Amino acid sequence: MLTKRIIPCLDVTLDRAGGCVVKGVEFVDLKEAGDPVELAKRYNEDGADELVFLDITASAHGRETMIDVIERTADEVFIPLTVGGGISSIDAIRQILRAGADKVSVNTSAVKNPDFIKESSDIFGAQCIVTAIDCRRNTDIKNNPDKTVLELEDGTPAWYEVVIYGGREATGIDAVQWAKKAEELGSGEILLTSMDRDGTCAGYDLPITRKLSEELDIPIIASGGVGNPQHIYEGFSEGKADAALAASIFHFSEYSIWEVKEYLREREIPVRL
């Protein structure tokens, strides 16, 4: 059985010189969590399997991803590094990979131009391309008969709508259908973030995580809502995810990566120690 991956996420803004890791609730009310390079070093030493580095304001502001911060981060870590935020061209991907990233995450640009996934996958390989999908629950079933309807924890039927620009713009696109299309176009992984759960510490959005894990053949990275090790366990055991991404519980030293992995190992979830 393949080991499950634990992936700290560094959400970075350019609000101060050199970049700053931030965390908020549903991508708003952001508070500083530290220097991205120092946090990356700590996670590398603590046993993280990979790192995800997201310039969360790049797409919204049309700004190029922070190449200098990527270079400094890549110099300090020796585990796979995925970089996302404002990536909308082949040249940008090339720059980021040259700066030291192992994979790139595409989100808004892929929704706007799905062929960008195929083009980038053809050039750099599917293993290099992660499609990030931000989604929100939508309980308007009556007016959306073509959507994939799932049953929420309380029995309410809902479909999941893709949102872009850091959650600021709804698209009307069904998240399950979009994930399948991204796989067909050549994406090597899906990074799934529930905007309803992001930063809430209420646990992963299990219905959509489980649905994508069951429907797709490529790995699903669960994201949004981790507040304790039990939530990560549920992401694997109930959500069937291949990897668990978390931010708050690691950034603010509530739990170490080693503690989380020990918790999972004791519950027979295969992890790399």
Swiss-Prot record:
Subunit structure comment from the entry: Heterodimer of HisH and HisF.
The species this protein was found in: Methanosarcina acetivorans (strain ATCC 35395 / DSM 2834 / JCM 12185 / C2A)
HAMAP family named among the record's database cross-references: HisF (MF_01013)
Catalytic activity: 5-[(5-phospho-1-deoxy-D-ribulos-1-ylimino)methylamino]-1-(5-phospho-beta-D-ribosyl)imidazole-4-carboxamide + L-glutamine = D-erythro-1-(imidazol-4-yl)glycerol 3-phosphate + 5-amino-1-(5-phospho-beta-D-ribosyl)imidazole-4-carboxamide + L-glutamate + H(+)
PANTHER family: IMIDAZOLE GLYCEROL PHOSPHATE SYNTHASE HISHF, IMIDAZOLE GLYCEROL PHOSPHATE SYNTHASE SUBUNIT HISF/H IGP SYNTHASE SUBUNIT HISF/H
Active-site residues from the entry: D11, D134
Gene assigned in the entry: hisF
GO molecular function per UniProt: imidazoleglycerol-phosphate synthase activity; lyase activity
Pfam families, alphabetized: His_biosynth
Cellular component GO terms, alphabetical: cytoplasm
Name the UniProt record assigns to this protein: Imidazole glycerol phosphate synthase subunit HisF
